[in-house]
Regions:
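An N-terminally biased module of ancient metal coordination in phosphate/nucleic-acid-related enzymes
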Residues: 1-65, 149-155, 167-176, 180-182, ...
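Extended substrate/RNA-proximal surfaces in nucleic-acid metabolism proteins
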Residues: 44-194, 253-265
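Acidic, metal/ion-coordinating pockets
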Residues: 268
Length: 268
């Protein structure tokens, strides 16, 4: 689940209230490359009796593919993780500034100030630009804005500094967390996964709104055949901007074994 700390629509406390209203009993906040929403979310979860799982979603790159690593039950005071996040946030902002300039130079009435106003947190990203494009009537959805204007091959695209997935695993483990490969069906090369497992990956997000039924079956079989010890996880990837977000919120499956481990995990 994402909040205004990165590219979500709702503040951490609002996301918790939405979750409670849906009868959700456990909630993981995994904002992109930031920890800034965790304290507020944890306090609100305590009020509503929800089990809170502090997390993060780290943006990484491998063979020109964007790979995301989820970290669950992380220690948000980790020095190494916070130092890396500061570097990532600075690089992220410089990239967004360049993208906004390209769009403005093409004649689109967009400014960095307007984009910044869409982010209430420390993390600013492409969805904030896409939201402005949507409000200007240039695109109909956030996904369309990212796909048609802000992705590789598009006029306003700017590559960004990223960690490697192996560096992300190290950072998550140094923060006493559980590293999980996020939505591999979107862009993760299959040949990379065994290398990540050998390096210390502990789970795969099998259930995700953008995974097809065939992909879900494939990853379930992959885990059963090659790495039975891997956690099978799932997430709504809730951002709050599209109608489908609300249908998916709380609807993704998480095996009971995995949920118990995520809830109770303590580093050995």
């Amino acid at each position: 689940v994402h909040t205004t700390a990165s590219d979500g629509k709702y503040q951490p406390r609002e996301v918790v209230r939405l979750a409670a209203g849906k009868g959700i009993t456990s909630l993981a906040i995994t904002d992109h490359d930031t920890l800034s929403g965790l304290q507020e979310a944890q306090a609100e979860c305590s009020k509503y009796g929800l089990k809170f799982i502090p997390g993060i979603e780290l943006s990484t790159s491998y063979a020109e593919k964007e790979i995301h690593l989820l970290g669950y039950n992380i220690d948000r005071t980790s020095r190494s993780l916070n130092a890396a996040l500061t570097e990532l946030q600075n690089a992220r902002r410089h990239r967004i500034e360049k993208m906004v300039k390209k769009l403005a130079d093409s004649g689109i009435p967009i400014t960095m100030q307007t984009v910044q106003s869409k982010s209430a947190g420390s993390s600013i990203g492409r969805p904030h630009i896409a939201l402005v494009l949507k409000e200007l009537g240039i695109v109909k959805t956030i996904d369309e804005g990212i796909k048609n204007y802000l992705s590789p091959g598009c006029p306003a695209y700017v590559p960004r500094y990223r960690l490697s997935p192996f560096e992300a695993i190290d950072l998550i483990k140094e923060a006493n967390g559980i590293p999980v490969l996020a939505h591999p069906g979107i862009s993760t090369p299959l040949e990379l996964i065994p290398n990540l497992i050998n390096y210390g990956l502990q789970g795969i997000e099998v259930y995700h709104p953008k995974h097809t039924a065939d992909q879900i079956v494939f990853y379930l079989h992959f885990i059963a055949d090659t790495a039975k010890s891997l956690l099978i996880t799932g997430g709504s990837d809730f951002h709050g901007y599209e109608k489908t977000d609300y249908a998916n919120f709380g609807a993704m499956k998480v095996p009971l074994r995995s949920l118990r481990i995520l809830k109770s995990y303590r580093p050995g």
